[in-house]
């Protein structure tokens, strides 16, 4: 999609906001930690509920394996161990260890999980916000790479994308990166004011995500340029 990546980010936000809003109202009526499984079963019958529940489980397994691979690889890269980062067995081992750590935190209890999430998410958001400020500053001050380009409002225009297939593919990928806000509703039975708080948190999360994704995508392609990002797609 070229320079229209920020447009893809806000377009993908629209269906996510609608789904989050539906979760809000469903949770108000029936705050059940089974979420999709429970609600679909009550509305459409056990078959639809079963399919919905298993679809989430299968997706979780695929995503967990993918994220474990990323965590394993970048753990080595963080310490400059490039050789180990290119070894799938070492990466798999560290990825499994990360899964074990997360499983233990979940076993300890929801409060430990919440505290760890506050720390990790806070560090992530602060880092991304700093990048979103520093990168454009370097572009306008002339200290960015030669491939850099100055931001433009046209980047937010989805109609600048000539190919319908590229637009569709971009939205599908962008929807995937919004993954995770629904976990807020899955802990509704362990939340104060369970009829309201999880749903509000879900909607707020999608709004925060679209803000972060749009400004970071603008900053990244402004600093490095779209061609550089395409050539190094595995790293971004």
Language-model region placement:
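Membrane-water interface regions at transmembrane-helix termini and the short interhelical loops
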Residues: 25-28, 51, 97-123, 187-190
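Central hydrophobic cores of alpha-helical transmembrane segments in multi-pass inner-membrane proteins
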Residues: 12-24, 98-107, 181-182
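Extracellular loop-to-transmembrane helix junctions
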Residues: 1-91, 205-211, 215
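Cytoplasmic juxtamembrane interface segments
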Residues: 31-40, 104-111, 185-188, 192-199
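Hydrophobic membrane-targeting signal helices
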Residues: 22, 75, 106-109, 132-136, ...
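Glycine-centered flexibility sites
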Residues: 2, 34-35, 45, 49, ...
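Helix-loop-helix junctions that connect adjacent transmembrane segments
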Residues: 5-9, 80-90, 119-236
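Select transmembrane alpha-helical segments in multipass membrane proteins
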Residues: 45-58, 94-97, 160-174
């Amino acid at each position: 999609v070229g320079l229209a990546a920020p447009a893809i980010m806000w377009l993908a936000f629209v269906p996510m906001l609608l789904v989050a809003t539906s979760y809000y109202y469903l949770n108000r009526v029936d705050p059940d930690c089974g979420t999709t499984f429970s609600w679909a079963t009550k509305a459409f019958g056990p078959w639809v509920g079963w399919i919905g529940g298993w679809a989430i489980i299968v997706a979780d397994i695929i995503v967990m394996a993918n994220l474990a691979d990323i965590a394993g690889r970048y753990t080595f890269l963080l310490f400059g161990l490039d050789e180990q980062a290119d070894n799938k067995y070492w990466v798999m081992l560290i990825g499994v260890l990360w899964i074990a750590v997360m499983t233990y935190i979940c076993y300890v209890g929801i409060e430990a999980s919440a505290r760890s999430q506050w720390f990790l998410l806070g560090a992530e958001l602060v880092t991304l916000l700093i990048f979103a400020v520093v990168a454009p500053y370097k572009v306008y001050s002339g200290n960015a790479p030669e491939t850099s380009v100055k931001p433009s409002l046209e980047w937010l225009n989805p109609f600048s994308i000539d190919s319908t297939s590229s637009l569709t593919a971009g939205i599908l990928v962008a929807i995937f990166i919004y993954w995770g806000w629904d976990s807020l509703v899955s802990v509704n039975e362990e939340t104060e004011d369970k009829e309201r708080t999880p749903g509000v948190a879900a909607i707020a999360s999608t709004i925060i995500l679209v803000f972060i994704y749009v400004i970071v995508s603008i900053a990244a392609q402004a600093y490095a340029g779209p061609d550089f990002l395409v050539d190094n797609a595995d790293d971004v």
